[in-house]
Design a protein with these regions (language model features):
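Histidine/lysine/aspartate-rich catalytic loop segments that bind and position anionic ligands
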Residues: 91-124, 128-133
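Glycine-rich beta-to-alpha transition loops that act as phosphate-gripper elements at the mouths
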Residues: 17-20, 65-71, 87-90, 107-112, ...
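Catalytic cores of alpha/beta
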Residues: 70-80, 113-121, 138, 157-173
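Conserved N-terminal beta1-alpha1 strand-loop-helix module at the mouth
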Residues: 1-83, 100, 160, 184, ...
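Glycine-rich phosphate-binding active-site loops on the catalytic face of alpha/beta enzymes
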Residues: 88-94, 128-136, 168-191, 197
Length: 212
């Protein structure tokens, strides 16, 4: 299955930020056990490219890079195995680099003008960031003038409120600290908690009539 289709079907991208590779792999496996297999490794994490390489070799996971700020960073992440590129802001060179290498481009945008620019430059999905500042109503309102644009709200989206964004028309959500918060102790209890939260996300999405 193509990466874009996996994202559209999976609905939730788990953001792994600030962890060294060994702990990131443990977290990713817990997420997979909970049913979340779309993983974003942020480039401001320790050993981020190594983590992307390691997770790209894990069966059943689709790994992308986040906090990608320019074309050079995008290229490095892609060479490490990233299948999609996420950015917090709109930078055309990052979109173009992703497209050049045939990976999914998900730039950040905050206004209708930025969203349209990203779409016209070839972005596959637009990351609406920070999402909670705009709310689900913004996602719904954008369906009128720009129904062809795929939106993925991120930033303040939680396991509990994700379904409201999906119901409003988002093709997926980015799940950060509400799913994987930062801790110094990645022990069995922490991993069990992540697995439980991942399962909860899928259950809530299904209960609210959103296919996962």
């Amino acid at each position: 299955m193509k990466t874009l289709n996996k994202i559209l079907e999976g609905k939730g991208i788990a953001i792994i930020r600030g962890y060294h590779t060994e702990d990131a792999v443990k977290i990713a496996r817990a997420l997979k056990k909970g049913g979340v297999t779309l993983l974003e490794v942020t480039l401001n994490s320790p050993d981020a490219l190594r983590t992307i390489r390691e997770l790209s070799n894990e069966s059943g996971m689709t790994v992308g890079a986040g906090t990608v700020l320019d074309g050079a960073a995008a290229q490095g992440a892609i060479e490490a195995g990233a299948k999609f590129i996420l950015s917090p802001t709109l930078k055309v060179e990052t979109i173009r680099t992703a497209k050049r290498y045939g990976v999914v481009s998900i730039p950040g945008a905050y206004t209708p003008s930025e969203i349209l620019t990203a779409f016209e430059e070839g972005a596959d999905i637009i990351k609406v960031f920070p999402a909670t500042a705009l709310g689900p109503s913004f996602i719904k309102d954008m369906q009128g003038p720009l129904p062809q644009v795929r939106l993925l709200p991120t930033g303040g989206v939680t396991v509990e409120n994700a379904a409201t964004f999906l119901e409003a028309g988002a093709v997926g959500v980015g799940l950060g600290s509400s799913l994987v918060h930062k801790t110094e102790c990645v022990d069995d209890a922490f991993l069990d908690e992540i697995e439980m939260k991942a399962k909860r996300f899928r259950e809530l999405a299904m209960m609210r009539g959103v296919r996962t």
